[in-house]
A protein has these predicted regions:
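Conserved structural position within tetratricopeptide repeats
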Residues: 11-14, 44-48, 82
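TPR/TPR-like (Sel1-like) alpha-helical repeat modules
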Residues: 70-89, 101
């Protein structure tokens, strides 16, 4: 079932490669199906193309953590905190705890 949704998002993205809503939807499907490498690649493209307010960075950091790339996870968390602050989201200002990484 998830693979059908992934294929649908990929088809939509192929006809509109800059559609950040579709990119984020594809990333969520990769996250649900545990495809961390694809998730990381898609989120990095999404972050470059969008004005994300911080949520994608948390997803990205979690994916990096799952594959053991702690330095990249820490950097993604930090970028997420900085981005959330720029957008005025105080709930996202928390620095990751030591155990988070």
């Amino acid at each position: 079932m998830a693979s059908n949704r992934i294929e649908l998002f990929k088809q939509m993205l192929s006809s509109d490669p800059g559609n950040t809503t579709v990119m984020f939807g594809l990333a969520k499907e990769y996250e649900k199906s545990g495809q961390d490498s694809e998730l990381i690649e898609t989120l990095n493209r999404y972050i470059e193309a969008s004005d994300d307010e911080g949520n994608a960075f948390g997803m990205l950091a979690s994916a990096y953590e799952r594959i053991g790339q702690r330095d990249q996870a820490k950097a993604a968390y930090q970028r997420g905190v900085e981005t959330a602050q720029r957008h005025g989201h105080p709930g996202h200002r928390r620095q990751p705890r030591q155990g988070d990484l």
